[in-house]
């Protein structure tokens, strides 16, 4: 399967660089998996697609202000993007500077703070801070907006690049499907008899890394930490018993649930995952999906194609572009029910050259 099969042309004007005034005011493109039918709605119309007894699974990770600016002892400027918090004082981070810092060297953080470069682990640097990491980041860190937003972070991003139910600090990118939900909408969902459960997957910066191989099967996913508790396992079992559907809010919730069910049975799990879901891979847990519009040739677009079917997904994206939907993290959303017989690119009907 070729990565190039997942490309599409997106007008720059459709990249959402700022959030809308209200979370719930996004548009919603629905895709019916069994038929491929599309419908253009508003995000609050999601309520019409939910049934009493359904279970919605959210990712409650909290985005940390993971971008720091500073300088080396030599005076050279650098930029730090925390990838993973290791403990109260240590992190793994990407460091951008003219010359990489050496082990044992000091880094002075703009706004106050100091770190030592401990060791290099491939592309990541292990840094030890003189004070506790999370309070330091809250004090002087910047929200790690995706590269395609292409603007400095603003004060409003601290609130809007964060779900209203975020609890567990550790992500360096938001689980963006959740950005559309406000408290009144969550209350309306509960009032309809829809249950909720929460997993945690700390989204890493690798989510924005391009796929650098030609064949999908040659791609190696970055690792991210996740936790699926026994309460989630029990909630899914209860949902199945009452005939409800498991609806994942975001691709990170999908990856969490399917990672915890790799052998076909959902079990509690805590640890790293590098699961790569692309067309041809079965789904063991998820019946429906709320998700944003993803980058061309991205692993997230491949996941959606695995869930909805490749031709159906690409047709939906073409329709979204035609109708002016806003793309990526601050953009609009889709609601997709699983295609029971999804096809992959190489399974599509061949062109007639007669």
Swiss-Prot record:
It comes from Pseudomonas savastanoi pv. phaseolicola (strain 1448A / Race 6) (Pseudomonas syringae pv. phaseolicola (strain 1448A / Race 6)). Disulfide bonds: none annotated. Monomer. This is S-adenosylmethionine:tRNA ribosyltransferase-isomerase. The keyword Cytoplasm applies. Keywords: Cytoplasm, Queuosine biosynthesis, S-adenosyl-L-methionine, Transferase. InterPro entries: QueA (IPR003699), QueA_dom1 (IPR042118), QueA_dom2 (IPR042119), QueA_sf (IPR036100). It is found in: Cytoplasm. NCBIfam families: PRK00147.1, queA. One of its GO terms (biological process) is tRNA wobble guanine modification. Transfers and isomerizes the ribose moiety from AdoMet to the 7-aminomethyl group of 7-deazaguanine (preQ1-tRNA) to give epoxyqueuosine (oQ-tRNA). It catalyses: 7-aminomethyl-7-carbaguanosine(34) in tRNA + S-adenosyl-L-methionine = epoxyqueuosine(34) in tRNA + adenine + L-methionine + 2 H(+). Belongs to the QueA family. One of its GO terms (molecular function) is S-adenosylmethionine:tRNA ribosyltransferase-isomerase activity. Its main location: cytoplasm.
